Amino acid sequence: MRTFKNYITEQKASDVLKNWRHDDAKEYAERLIKTFREPDEVTETTLSWNSIEPPFDRVWVIDESIPHDFPAAHRDYVYSSMKIQVPTELLDILGHASGSIIYDGLKMEVTARCGTLYANAATLGFVKDLVDGKIKPNKEQ
């Protein structure tokens, strides 16, 4: 008897990456595969890892290359998420801090989008410090 699983073809990261249009995102995804192993999820345009050790809950690379000029010119394609509950009064501050901070209030999850995991860690660290009161914003910020 054939089961549903017999009809499913699992995509491999290497097969999907052959068709990616953005070389910078593709090269970074390949580097993450070497460092963290094959992704947990593979689609035509996204590779994601749900099991990279903290600080991230989830990391994913999308076949995109978004120009971003803060703090210096670079391109964004890697996303990292953490569970951080952001008080409502801080949301406007986060929105103005960087276009690369995304907050999902229903999941209480903050996502950083940048060009490296290091930059995402720094961004999420900033959010955590702001929420924990270690950073006090002023009107000039």
Model feature map: region roles:
Residues 14, 21, 25-141:
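A cross-family detector of function-defining hotspots
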Residues 1-10:
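Charge-dense, intrinsically disordered terminal/linker segments
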